[in-house]
Amino acid sequence: MNMEIKNILTLLMLCFSILIYGQWTDSATGRVNMTNEFNIYGLIGVIDLNIDSPSREVIGSSYVNENFLSGTISNREMVYSMRYNAYRDEMEIELQGKPFYLPKTNNYSINFDIINKEYQLLDYTENGESKKGFFVVLDKNDKTQLLIKESIKLYKEVPAKLGFTRYEPPKLGRLKDEIYIAKNNEAIKLPTKKKDILNFFSNKSKEIDLFAKKNKIGFKKTEDLIKIINYYNTLN
């Protein structure tokens, strides 16, 4: 048997083993074990079958982009249809026509080349609680990276007051994007005020302040923050 035929047979056996891998459903939790599907990608975990769709009465969307787009996981070759649920902070993947949540186990990236957008799953802290969440990479580099956190909030319904106000149904609305810094697989929220940002980079605050003044760069716009981070990376 020549090497080419042997490689083809090996590939077919791998595909077949993935297709027939035992998928079991726990009726109590509504979860499907798709672990073997992601062993190839180092994403070993359980994918949630239940996508929490808002009620029809809710106005708005859970998504920044509702469409499933072609993307890759950590730059692997296999392409999947995926979308980000900004209300649940979950990455949804479409498998055999059904949506699932990607497991939040090891940190990884999701690349949507068609829209030139990358999400990274990173550790972060919110209100004193350690979490894992998806962040959009604004500037890709091997050191400190600038990120944004996309969030959508559910606003509760407003009951009608007889003769005064109308009933307002619950609605989903996008919040202002928050700026984070990524370092060593952890996302850290960046302060909003110039003084606090300089203190954030305490060991290089003087150099950054001089750089910003010399180049007339502010501390509010994302394009200016990208320049500051790129300069900071040259100082390390």
Language-model-detected regions and their locations in the chain:
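An amphipathic alpha-helical core segment
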Residues: 170-214
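Exposed alpha-helical structural elements
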Residues: 19, 107-109, 196, 207
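Aromatic-patch recognition
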Residues: 62-189
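Intrinsic-disorder/low-complexity, polar/charged segments
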Residues: 27-30, 193, 221
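Bacterial Sec-dependent N-terminal signal peptides
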Residues: 1-27, 228
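Long, compositionally biased interface segments
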Residues: 199-236
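Sec-dependent signal peptide cleavage junction
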Residues: 22-57
